[in-house]
């Protein structure tokens, strides 16, 4: 099948922002102008096309990232809508993995807010080229220039305006295109009619100042242009665009545009910039991975290369069942064909292929290199798996997901729904790698764990709506962990020899604290323990580590070296070695100076100045460490690290202390040792 658009005319972009910066409205407008929707959906009326789960429409926030295809000026644009609420940063992480470029949306009044910083850092991690769109130019307190300065100060971004606004707040009329040196004024409400005019006389000087700053920033990226500029020659629009595109793709410059999506101003110009400056799949480096022998390998964006695709999100659709949102990096994926899930080493059949327009879908015969779509009919594939051709397998770099920090006990309102709830929770955990569910061995309760209170509220909500399971939910608990502080050597010996067949397993391990994940190293020499019993020892240790010895919390950040052991020709079995492994682990834990770790949250509280003292005192009383303070838009911002256990119910307390004027955001930062007195309290509560 011939391509409708050549690869250089593809743009796979994400729209990322702080909650409420107007990201979904912006996406809506893009869909409207690119002809995908005939009626504009307003978020505050609860009808936005991208927000397709009922909870999103009620809360006016975006939770799942839907991939939508639209067309603009002979380009195919795939938009991945990412949530801005901090409990859903995992959605942002996974969408950034499959994007080539991103538009960061900022609120002209708030500028760079805490979540914008988080999302920006995530984009840095994946080297995603970005442009910025400063939205809400029509609201009270909008300040374009302050927002640009905040991008420079707080994000260390080389932010360069390529447009400046004409007027602001109620008088926001349009913008000045600094590259073409002309004014664009909107003459109707839908923003479909606009006039290109001369720059208003009272703005000529300002436009000149910003235009020369922009040209200086751009020529710095290109030696040839620099020489031309220094010799006083005129630099053409084409030259500016070419140099700017190169700079954006190399992550050296961030062009800044402005507008008001709600008032339909500036969106088309922002789309022009997406097409003009953000990379196509050909502009980014080949995707990296490993072949079946573990050697480094890569795939270029080319239809003739072997197939390599990444399933970046699993969603359950009420009509077609499981949808796997996938990006094809190389080769062609055909409906009805077989592929290899190289992460799991299993064959999968591609049922149907669909391109999504938020929640209508269009069936296609194939997805080519650089395209995004969803696969219907995969059985085994989960988030982060690689799909590749059977005769040329590759495993693309895996995605990393943080561990949950908060958990609650949950039970169905009727005994009859117990099984239904179990199935539903398993489905939800398959969709969302940061959501975990397990049964507490001591109490028999079902526990759900996630990234924050909102995250779990939405899970419970979905259980009721999508799976029709009514639940009772306990009080949120902190997901504590246990770890060790010193290296030790210990053994576990399991011997049972009382008539009939006995049991014999014996393992000697060295256990050391580490910063990273659990590691197991087999250092047995001379066959002291036969090969087939090594894995059972590892399994025994891993199972035992799920329930630590201080207060039964999972043990993390340690590594094990199996150094010795012994076996019995007749009595040894896998089971016996598994038990020996878990005994060795427990013996090692008691000697290794174990401690409890608690999640520490990065908290930002924004309050009017008069409440500053009171709020700082309150943060300190919650065992908080204040990291810094700054003034922002007439309010004081306090930045601190506070243990999660002290933050439950903080929203209510902050509201009452500040008469509803204070706001805060928090997100998980790291785990830290619990002070002795608190540790004793935790142990007491568990007993």
Swiss-Prot record:
CDD domains: EF-G, EFG_III, EFG_mtEFG1_IV, EFG_mtEFG_C, EFG_mtEFG_II. GO terms for molecular function: GTP binding; GTPase activity; translation elongation factor activity. InterPro entries: EF-G-like_DII, EFG_II, EFG_III, EFG_III/V, EFG_IV, EFG_V, EFG_V-like, G_TR_CS. One of its GO terms (cellular component) is cytoplasm. It comes from the Bacteria. One of its GO terms (biological process) is ribosome disassembly. Residues 8-282 form the tr-type G domain. GTP binds at residues 17-24, 81-85, 135-138. Pfam families: EF-G_D2, EFG_C, EFG_III, EFG_IV, GTP_EFTU. It is found in: Cytoplasm. Coiled coil: none annotated. Its main location: cytoplasm. The keyword GTP-binding applies. Keywords: Cytoplasm, Elongation factor, GTP-binding, Nucleotide-binding, Protein biosynthesis. Catalyzes the GTP-dependent ribosomal translocation step during translation elongation. During this step, the ribosome changes from the pre-translocational (PRE) to the post-translocational (POST) state as the newly formed A-site-bound peptidyl-tRNA and P-site-bound deacylated tRNA move to the P and E sites, respectively. Catalyzes the coordinated movement of the two tRNA molecules, the mRNA and conformational changes in the ribosome. Belongs to the TRAFAC class translation factor GTPase superfamily. Classic translation factor GTPase family. EF-G/EF-2 subfamily. This is Elongation factor G. The lineage of its organism: Bacteria, Bacillati, Bacillota, Clostridia, Eubacteriales. The gene is fusA.
């Amino acid at each position: 099948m011939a391509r409708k658009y050549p690869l250089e005319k593809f743009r796979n972009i994400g729209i990322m922002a702080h909650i409420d910066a107007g990201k979904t409205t912006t996406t809506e407008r893009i869909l409207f102008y690119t002809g995908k929707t005939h009626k504009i959906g307003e978020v505050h009326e609860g009808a936005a096309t991208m927000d397709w789960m009922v909870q999103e429409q009620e809360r006016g926030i975006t939770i799942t990232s839907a991939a939508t295809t639209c067309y603009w000026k002979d380009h195919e644009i795939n938009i991945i809508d990412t949530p801005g609420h901090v409990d859903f940063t995992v959605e942002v992480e996974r969408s950034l993995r499959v994007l080539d470029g991103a538009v960061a949306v900022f609120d002209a009044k708030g500028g760079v807010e805490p979540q914008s910083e988080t999302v920006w850092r995530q984009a840095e991690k994946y080297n995603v080229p970005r442009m910025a769109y400063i939205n809400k130019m029509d609201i009270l307190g909008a300040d374009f220039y302050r927002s640009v300065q905040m991008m420079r100060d707080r994000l260390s971004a080389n932010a360069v305006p390529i447009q400046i606004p004409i007027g602001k707040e109620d008088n926001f009329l349009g913008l000045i295109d600094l590259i073409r040196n002309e004014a664009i004024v909107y003459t109707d409400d839908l923003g479909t009619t606009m006039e290109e005019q001369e720059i208003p006389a009272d703005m000529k000087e300002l436009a000149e100042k910003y235009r020369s700053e922009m040209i200086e920033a751009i020529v710095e990226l290109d030696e040839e242009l620099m020489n031309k500029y220094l010799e006083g020659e005129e630099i053409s629009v084409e030259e500016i665009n070419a140099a700017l595109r190169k700079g954006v793709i190399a992550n050296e410059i961030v062009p800044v545009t402005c507008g008001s999506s709600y008032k339909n101003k500036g969106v088309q110009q922002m789309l022009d910039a997406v097409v003009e400056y953000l990379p196509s799949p050909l502009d980014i480096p080949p995707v990296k991975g490993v072949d079946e022998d573990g050697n480094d390998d890569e795939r270029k964006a080319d239809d003739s290369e072997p197939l390599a695709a990444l399933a970046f999100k699993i969603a359950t659709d009420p009509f077609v069942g499981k949808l796997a949102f996938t990006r094809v990096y190389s080769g062609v994926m055909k409906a009805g064909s077989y592929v290899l899930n190289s992460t799991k080493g299993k064959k999968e059949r591609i049922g149907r292929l669909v391109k999504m327009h938020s929640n209508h879908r269009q069936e296609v015969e194939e997805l080519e290199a650089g395209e995004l779509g969803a696969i219907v009919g995969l059985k085994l594939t989960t988030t982060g798996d690689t799909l590749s051709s059977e005769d040329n397998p590759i495993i693309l770099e895996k995605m990393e997901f943080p561990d949950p920090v908060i958990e609650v006990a949950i039970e169905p309102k009727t005994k009859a729904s117990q099984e239904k709830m179990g199935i539903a929770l398993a489905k939800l955990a398959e969709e969302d790698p940061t959501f975990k569910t397990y049964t507490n061995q001591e109490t028999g309760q079902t526990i759900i764990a996630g990234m924050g209170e909102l995250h779990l509220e939405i899970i419970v909500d979905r259980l009721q709506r999508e799976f029709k399971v009514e639940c009772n939910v306990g009080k949120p608990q902190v997901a504590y962990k246990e770890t060790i502080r010193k290296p030790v050597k210990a053994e576990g010996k399991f011997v049972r020899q009382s008539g009939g067949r006995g049991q014999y397993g014996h393992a000697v391990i060295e256990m050391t604290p580490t910063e990273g994940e659990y590691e197991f190293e087999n250092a047995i020499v001379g066959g002291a323990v036969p090969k087939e019993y090594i894995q059972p020892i590892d399994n025994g240790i891993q199972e035992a580590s799920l329930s630590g010895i201080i207060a039964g919390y999972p043990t993390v950040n340690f590594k094990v070296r199996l150094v010795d052991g012994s076996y019995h020709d007749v009595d040894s079995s896998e089971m016996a070695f598994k038990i020996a492994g878990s005994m060795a682990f427990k013996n090692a834990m008691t000697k290794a100076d174990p401690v409890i770790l608690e999640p520490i949250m990065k908290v930002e509280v924004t309050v009017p100045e008069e409440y500053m003292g009171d709020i700082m005192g309150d943060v300190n009383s919650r065992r908080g460490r204040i990291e810094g303070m700054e003034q922002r838009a007439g309010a004081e911002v306090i930045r601190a690290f506070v243990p999660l256990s002290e933050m439950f119910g903080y929203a209510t307390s902050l509201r009452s202390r500040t008469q509803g004027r204070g706001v805060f955001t928090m997100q998980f930062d790291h785990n830290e040792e619990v002070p002795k007195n608190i540790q004793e309290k935790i142990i007491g509560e568990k007993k």
